[in-house]
Design a protein with these regions (language model features):
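Generic preference for hydrophobic/aromatic residues in regular secondary structure cores
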Residues: 1-3, 20, 32-34, 95-99, ...
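Short helix-loop boundary/capping segments
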Residues: 63-117
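Low-complexity, flexible helical/coil segments
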Residues: 59, 87-97, 132-141, 153
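Short, solvent-exposed loop/turn segments that connect beta-strands within catalytic domains
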Residues: 8-9, 105-110, 153-155
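Intrinsically disordered, low-complexity segments enriched in small/polar residues
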Residues: 4, 16-18, 35, 68-69, ...
């Protein structure tokens, strides 16, 4: 799901992106180490940190692509056709992304939900079209998302949350 930057988890502003596959999630802190000439031990910390998500959309249309691209592309849709239009936009608006994994445990549905608060796609749409006769004819759309700190949130909880039903 995707929503405008600043959207709370309980908001109804989330847009379903359709079926997809998440390939990876990674929290990437950039560490630093500084040692003064007269100090016995170095001081270590984190200078920057991002979260990265990669995956593939299986179901997508022009409206979904426009929404997740944060203004890089735009879309129109009618009852019979959807159209993506791109080129010339130079501002990408960060979005909030929420990825939900559903699993069945002993007959009970359990969810794991990953939410990043301020993120953008790393590139525009990419599709490798396949033949109808391909063993797997579904043309997926790969994506990569990079989330940055949302400094409007409390320190320590500015990048992402992961909740998992037990």
């Amino acid at each position: 799901e995707v929503a405008p930057y600043g959207t709370t988890a309980a908001s109804s502003a989330w847009t379903n992106l359709g079926a997809g596959i998440v390939n990876s999630f990674k929290h990437v802190p950039t560490k630093y180490s500084v040692q003064a000439g007269n100090a016995p031990d170095p001081i270590e910390g984190v200078s920057t940190e991002v979260a990265q998500i990669t995956g593939e959309l299986i179901e997508y249309d022009a409206t979904v692509l426009s929404t997740i691209n944060g203004g890089l592309i735009s879309a129109t849709a009618t009852s019979s056709v959807s159209t993506v239009v791109a080129g010339g936009n130079n501002i990408i608006t960060p979005m909030a992304f929420r990825i939900t994994n559903k699993r069945i445990v002993s007959g009970t549905t359990k969810y794991t939900t990953l939410t990043v608060f301020k993120a953008t796609l790393d590139g525009g749409p990419e599709i490798t079209f396949k033949s109808d006769n391909d063993a797997d004819p579904i043309a997926v759309m790969p994506f990569a998302i990079t989330a940055k700190l949302d400094t409007s949130l409390t320190a320590g909880s500015q990048l992402y949350t992961i909740t998992r039903d037990l």
